[in-house]
A protein has these predicted regions:
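A cross-family phosphate/adenosyl-ligand binding-site feature
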Residues: 2-199
């Protein structure tokens, strides 16, 4: 078995490199996730088609998103934005929140959406990835656009999360606090700090 390749050195990224924050079709903690993205220095959004459909239901239509972020949409079969990873434009890929579908694809090496393609290419470039998996507890209380509901993930969802956590250069966040802590550690590594305001 080969030894894992070390993470990409910080001096291999551009001085003004960004976070690449991917949004999938989950509403679980989506508002809290976007709030964290707003507080990061230099953060761009990458939306799956489902993510683009879901965000307006939680108060984030495209117009509002573009007031705060540079936004990339999943409308290109070639996923052209992925090439920016190779140029050192992005030092970290975040998927938050990540649906069970996205987690399964990432865990199995399937890259047929903008977020999953970014994740796969980041791994091949030894760029750290942080994935906030939604289905990580026997019972998950989550907010839909109209009400709170209980979701009971299946064994296969737990298996996929465990499989994902074993992939090189990947940190799986099981809770919002885990996500915040993983971002905090990455900011420290990059000698960056949270923005004091998310407005």
């Amino acid at each position: 078995m080969t030894q894992p390749t070390p993470a990409r050195r910080l001096d291999e990224f551009k001085p003004d490199a960004h976070f690449a924050w991917c949004v999938t079709g989950s509403g679980h903690m989506i508002e809290e996730s976007i709030d964290l993205a707003l507080r990061l220095p230099r953060c761009d959004l990458f939306l799956s088609s489902a993510g683009e459909e879901v965000l307006p239901l939680y108060g984030w239509p495209m117009k509002r998103l573009r007031e705060h972020f540079k936004v990339f949409r999943d409308n290109s079969a070639s996923s052209v934005p992925v090439g920016m990873l190779y140029n050192g434009d992005y030092h970290t890929v975040v998927i938050a929140p990540a649906t069970s579908n996205t987690v399964a694809k990432c865990a199995l090496g399937i890259s047929d959406t903008l977020p999953t393609n970014l994740f796969a290419q980041a791994g091949k470039q030894c760029v750290p990835g942080i994935v906030f998996a939604c289905d990580t507890a026997p019972s998950v209380i989550t907010q839909t656009p109209h009400e709170w509901v209980e979701v009971r993930p299946r064994a296969i969802e737990f298996d996929n999360v465990e499989r994902l956590a074993r992939i090189e250069h990947t940190t799986v966040a099981y809770t919002l606090d885990d996500l915040r802590a993983a971002l905090d550690r990455r900011l420290t590594q990059l000698t960056l700090a949270w923005n004091t305001s998310s407005s």
